[in-house]
């Protein structure tokens, strides 16, 4: 207590002490304690967590008093770790600790809301039409009425509605759209199911039952690293954060661990007490640098150059000059380095072609099953073998898809030969593309020949067709690509680290600005540690590298380093990519629930990047051409057209999905086929070949082939992840926008070849936008209907993360406040109303669904050699081979509600599975009938019920091997049939363990090891990706079955990326068009625009939270270097404007010496609804970080039908990169709040 009264003569406290002076007797008033107790007393504590995409997945105590949440604190009862590991707790962060503020704040959505103009028209239409579908038609078919409420989007004007009214309007709109245009014109976007998997499943299940389109998120967010599927055939699999503690050398490369992985950062600091060295690699002085022994600051966007130089050192010192036995054995057994590659003859030199296959050779090396998909190598005896494990062994035969060192024909043990040097027939000159001399004036270049000729040892082989071919190994190609001289007098190879040749440390020094001595030192230390510890060197990596256009080059650079050093699959080592809470651990139990696979298959999925690139018409403004992306050795005549042309070709060849799919209502095709006397599949094939049916993507703006209804839930699409924000406003929403640039027609640019061009792009494509949220976000402002959802303390759900092995509950500590409902209850009610409204319009319908060639299915062996396009007459249209699968799905629309609320019969008829393996689920269905009870009548009679979110959670937990030991054993047994090795021992000790929802409410539960992931959870090892591949000899799901360094698909070769290369950031050409055009009298400068993850929010969540705003600056900010700020006359906290041809934004300036000159940082997802004045450029309220971005897709991410390069939802596809973007920065002159309240000001310029 305060002793301020002790200073006065007549006011004295008792001064007696006790306990040797540690205690004191006081007589002060203690009434204050009553207030303290009243504030902090509570009636109960409930366990929950935060369903936000932060990867934390922390367990929290939610304190409830009088039916209200009063506060939250961190739980500390995680299951114990091994004796040699620190505990997982404390887990939490300031953002999570502030969440209870939202529940009763002014930001909270309390009631269903509808745009006033739309409500007025809807009520008038209902008065005239008794049928809700006809009422909706009367509005949306009237162009003036539709335009009037679409143009109001983003301007407020919401009024309170009722659940009955909004559900009826939504259902009527869905029924109208399906009936007139097709179910694939109804779409939904929701990200990261792992953060609240039942809530995600609620909307996805509804959409899938009606045939709607579920949009991807991992690729759209640019969280997906395409290098992972390219190398491992795996979307992403990474170590848990506890495995950091097992490492003895860690590089944190572009990952700001203490800021963006706050709950896990203690492992990073704790491992340093063991002597582990830590290195930070970031262009700015980020918080991670404070926790490290060394900080390297390469120029932003040049990370691949530094990784190449480090790889150069590792290969020189640990593979050539002083070979590590461990490294050599590792790359021989677990990589494609021994595999043979055919060389193609060019003008005076050779180029690396595709991998040699058994089918290329006489008698196919004795392989009868899939010989064109079996890779070939020489063994150390000089014999050619097709070793076990390649993708051809996975499908069509059993028992040889493993990494045992055996000949695939004889089964005899064999050791593969890494290099042909010493046994070659001749030395050949092979060309390698070089891009290090490309780029803009903002990045350093090293001018060399654009085709570098290297000398390689080769052998000449007789092929099955009688011709001969030269071959070399991937190992030899890799050494040459890295510029390593091996006594072959190769003038383009380096003899010293000081040679400025690709890709030496001296070369990288000129590109990155990092000294060659530092590059050499870190590479040497990293590899030496890995050699001595057998792989305990780790790279933690994140969005800093993954958000660039050539992100796969950045990532493959790091992955190659790890592979060269034998780190992948070893505890304490490997690739630790953390961008997004991607790990939905009980995935195989969740998928049937989410996509209604228990009732009908397949679901409609779409990759969001291609979807939004097309339908928000961003392609109309494209400035990047395929020609500038191609290898100098490619035949450019094969790659003509616009970038969207490549996407369209990929769709029709079955590589990528489409949405909408066809240029006609898919519900009408079966009827037309019946009239023609054909089955629907044959009729569709015939119509596509004739051109009477076209892919919708070929005519995106004809008024029929665009999305019409969009659901958004668990997402702030227009306030966080929507790259090309202003284009979405104009073309999807039809409202006010800030686009400054001209489209291709206005520029006189090159028009697409595959897509019909219209001079005026179609605006306002979406008829209805429905958003579910607990707070009024930017997306809500642009919606037509807002539905109030329960917060994370008001609903039951589940949450998992890649950062730890636990599964956490979200629990309803209190009932949803006001009229809010959980996502499950909202979509259940919509499904019920839809089932009523559709009667008379939709009944039992036959839907034609196109499905791209799927990864982890036998169909991925579709196109083994060259790329052939059926539309160009290069091959026939064969569904599932040269084109998408064409599937027939029977839908029962009036039974939608009954199906939504029950588990369908397909789980018993077909079973369940994931990632290429399947198992029987009869016993699990029997258990679910007992747990959830069954439907007593109706279309789902006798099926287990899904009435509540807890019922849905129990379905996930019961069906998933990660939470049901019996299923885990069945899943491992199913995999054992493929590999010929027994893996069930990995789960037998957990066979009787079944995790229930009430179990995880009592305490977090650790998941059970499952074959659908590549790591193990047990007492002996922390989860580490690739562990089962290395230790259980389970192949990676790639062409070779090994870690794939060489990408031999024709597009990868022709775009110059079969091997790792450095590619500088692309030129988006978004600045030259606007700089100096709308001057306000202040200096302007072009700067690179980066959007790292922020400190005071998780994406946009918490960015409007008063507690977080108080800790930060209270609104949007942009960070500038001191040098750039000086040039521009900007002082700290000045209002600035950031703009380019895509749009404009306003923010406060943060001037800091931690930011290097030439770049600016606007921390990602600062809401546009807080403290934001108008833009001088647009005369509108300043935008968000994505107002100055636009998508540019990369053709190599469109590849499909090719083993590991095949489509899977969120697995592979185009990504939404944005860090190559440049903006113009200037100080604002007129600060206009656009509110008429007299707070505007003029900001004086600094001389």
Curated annotation (Swiss-Prot):
Compartments where located? Cell membrane
User: Predominant location of this chain?
Assistant: membrane
Briefly describe its induction. By nitrate.
Q: Where does [4Fe-4S] cluster bind?
A: 50, 54, 58, 93
Q: Which GO terms describe its molecular function?
A: 4 iron, 4 sulfur cluster binding; electron transfer activity; metal ion binding; molybdopterin cofactor binding; nitrate reductase (quinone) activity; nitrate reductase activity
Cofactor info, note text: Binds 1 [4Fe-4S] cluster per subunit.
- Per UniProt, Mo-bis(molybdopterin guanine dinucleotide) binds at 223
Give the EC number(s) listed in the UniProt record. 1.7.5.1
Q: Name one GO cellular component term.
A: membrane
User: Its quaternary structure?
Assistant: Dimer of heterotrimers each composed of an alpha, a beta and a gamma chain. Alpha and beta are catalytic chains; gamma chains are involved in binding the enzyme complex to the cytoplasmic membrane. Interacts with the NarJ chaperone.
Q: What is this protein called?
A: Respiratory nitrate reductase 1 alpha chain
**What organism is listed for this UniProt entry?**
Escherichia coli (strain K12)
